[in-house]
Amino acid sequence: LVQMSVSDMNYKEIPEEVEFTEKIGAIAFNLYFLVCTGRGQGNTDISNAAYEEALKMLYEQQMKYKGKLMINSKCAPQYKRVVYENDPDSVYTRTYSGGCPAATHYSRISPEGNLTPCPFIEESVGNLKSRSFKDLWENAPLMIQLRDRKQLDGKCGTCEFSAMCSGCRARAFAETGNYMDPDPSCDYEPGKHGGKAITLKVEDTLGLEVEFQTQWTPEAKERLERIPSF
């Protein structure tokens, strides 16, 4: 596995780094985009123009090394939009999780037991010493808000790709103090693809809201009951 953090200084080296990844026999390449929060607030972020170009370069490499390398972006929900613009039927669009993963696919638990929606969001929604993970995940107001794409403001709220992208909520908060404001790293202007919300078939929307019921065996239920956080 090779991982690269992208910036204005090195984004043009993406093809070389992917080539290097294959050359050394690695099976995966991840391109990380800085989220300027916490200790990263004073770091130099990539410009919006370079951000978009880097995503397009990554897609080109994904096609070039298809079947040879697993190539992915991290902290760049807009990548799914770039893939869709090139190939609406891409396996990546159909099976990769939809949008910002904060409160939808992952969260963070601090050493003190505080639960936050994302490693880049510092606001705690509660502590696992007093409330279960399940309770906080399902009922904490901030977790519910972040999962509701209808609450997105500005161009993220009117974007055709809000369901599959939604922008980075940590970047929005770092910029304006509002979790639902537009992602400042994105220059895409809604309307380019007609303005109508683009949705995928339910069976193709891993990570988006799908109704299902989990069936637990009696043995599994017994084991779960012994775990305090659940």
Name the predicted role of every residue range:
Residues L206-F230:
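Non-catalytic accessory segments flanking P-loop/AAA+ NTPase cores
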Residues T104-H105, P184, F212:
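Structural beta-strand/beta-sheet cores of well-ordered domains, especially the beta-sheet scaffolds
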Residues F120-E209:
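Flexible mid-to-C-terminal extensions adjoining Fe-S/redox cofactors in radical SAM and related proteins
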Residues E17, L136-N139, I227:
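Generic alpha-helical secondary-structure signal
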Residues L1-E112, T116-R131:
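Radical SAM enzyme [4Fe-4S]-AdoMet core and its adjacent flexible, acidic
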Residues P101, D148, W216:
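Residue-level marker of regulatory loop/turn positions in helix-turn-helix DNA-binding domains and
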